[in-house]
Amino acid sequence: MDRPPSLPHYQNPNPNLFYHYPPPNSNPNFFFRPPPPPLQNPNNYSIVPSPPPIRELSGTLSSLKSLLSECQRTLDSLSQNLALDHSSLLQKDENGCFVRCPFDSNHFMPPEALFLHSLRCPNTLDLIHLLESFSSYRNTLELPCELQLNNGDGDLCISLDDLADFGSNFFYRDCPGAVKFSELDGKKRTLTLPHVLSVECSDFVGSDEKVKKIVLDKCLGVLPSDLCAMKNEIDQWRDFPSSYSSSVLSSIVGSKVVEISALRKWILVNSTRYGVIIDTFMRDHIFLLFRLCLKSAVKEACGFRMESDATDVGEQKIMSCKSSTFECPVFIQVLSWLASQLAVLYGEGNGKFFALDMFKQCIVESASQVMLFRLEGTRSKCSGVVEDLDDARLRNKDVIMEKPFENSSGGECGKTLDSPQVISVSRVSAAVAALYERSLLEEKIRAVRYAQPLTRYQRAAELGFMTAKADEERNRRCSYRPIIDHDGRPRQRSLNQDMDKMKTREELLAEERDYKRRRMSYRGKKVKRTPRQVLHDMIEEYTEEIKLAGGIGCFEKGMPLQSRSPIGNDQKESDFGYSIPSTDKQWKGENRADIEYPIDNRQNSDKVKRHDEYDSGSSQRQQSHRSYKHSDRRDDKLRDRRKDKHNDRRDDEFTRTKRHSIEGESYQNYRSSREKSSSDYKTKRDDPYDRRSQQPRNQNLFEDRYIPTEKE
């Protein structure tokens, strides 16, 4: 029996489902092509992927910009990991540097000029005028010091109201109304100075500087390995530390060799990171507070060092110092106090981190100064205080500089924290008051710089809040008067004396009924008034009250007001020149009837007069029988009638003037026609009222449209 032939391993019984490529070509010929794949089912064609789109020039530029931004971000993170100060990246020379404007990255300037530049950047914004109202903190840096006795263990409480101009919460300077909030103006700003800080001031006697000098003479240096460990330790501080290591202790004890100019420049440059751009005066105030807190921290660290020296001896002393940690309650207290003072200007969060970072910077600077085996290039060129650090002995003797020169920042290079400086209670109080004053200036600057239009909901919410606050303020003041009643212009009260009396239920119901009727009548009359007209009427009403009270344009109270319309109620329209002068001269010598209003207008005026008589009589009857009605209702009706009467008169006068101009042209023709027919003319003069007779009369075309009138 024959064996069935076997299929090759690369063949597939169903080529439409699976396809295996043939085995590698055994032919070494380079130009050999493998056989094409078998045909597939037309329903199973695969879609060939489209080629990638060609990028345009704009897309390429955007990709390059994103790449550059990523590179810049990487460099920034690298510089932060290396603990590089961003202010040292833009070195101007050995004594100064340039900083970048936070509002325009193309502007570079010295740190001392950044504050004034920020008030003019951009060019459309100019806030220099705000410095005129807040400038007292610039003059309180050198206050006199008064020597006092030790205050004991209690804290000092000092008032700050006399040390700075905090302004007043006035919307209007000359009005004692509810536009001024008493809880804000009545708030007294005080400073509480803890005992651990007050004893470090120069005002008090009993300072223990001799003890600290003894400890500083025995201070140990910091090894390079300890410096790295100390940096890692303080980088982990996210809150006020409850304890620190011996390396931090040594850095705090040796912090008096840190240069003042370096710390001042750091405060001035890095204040922008915490949201506020400060000037050199504010920098000096902040540095004074920091230096006071540092003195208490150094005093506590010296106490820890003296305790370790008394308990341990020799090698055990060194090993115990390297491995032990020290609880620091005073360090926490002074940090909290400094953060609370900086929170006035920077806010609670930024003030806390700013105070903590200042101490971190000081500790790092001190450790780099007291570090053993330093290179010559890392030593300060203008220090002159620490001469020999390799032998772990810090010489705290008075070192006389030849001539301390001033750098570009205005500070004296060579002065360290060990240099004598008067830190009095008055200067500390002035520094805290400067923070309050500077915060008010910062609020005004931000209100102008970051001004944004409020939404309708925000405006309504702010209006409701201010209204509720004003109501609360009015309830606290029994002698509150509206603004219009101030300045000697009391408003005219209602003439109805019944308003001050207790009213019965019937009177109240009658008033409510009258109010509804008046509202319905106003709704029908004033429906065509625009909001502008309503506001105009309100302003006129208040203006009348002010004039009656002796206000604008009146030298005495109660002077009669001039009518708002050019025509008085008891004056004729001819007195104001509404008639044509030339026509009057021509008709003055003729014996004829003067021109009057047209018949329909005259009838309307008669109706108005009859209505006036009826209303006056009815108002008298109502006043005699119903005394509970308000007089303002009659005043409103009379005012409306006067306005309507005035408008009708103006319209009639305009029609009359226009008619006179037409009749004046044909008057000469009329005279010639009268001379030709003298008999008819005499008849017209003898019977001037024949126009009202019921008998028909033949008149010419001119007489049909000419109506003689009586003399006014």
Curated annotation (Swiss-Prot):
Keyword hit for Nucleus: yes
Zinc fingers (CHHC U11-48K-type), renumbered ranges: 98-125
Principal localisation: nucleus
Region entry Disordered, spans: 562-712
Entry's Gene Ontology molecular function annotations: zinc ion binding
Superkingdom: Eukaryota
Composition skew (Basic and acidic residues), residue ranges: 585-595, 603-614, 629-663, 672-693, 702-712
Compartments (UniProt record): Nucleus
One annotated GO biological process: mRNA processing
Domain comment quoted from the record: The CHHC region interacts with the 5' splice site of the U12-type intron.
Assembly notes: Component of the U11/U12 snRNPs that are part of the U12-type spliceosome. Not found in the major spliceosome.
Name of the protein: U11/U12 small nuclear ribonucleoprotein 48 kDa protein
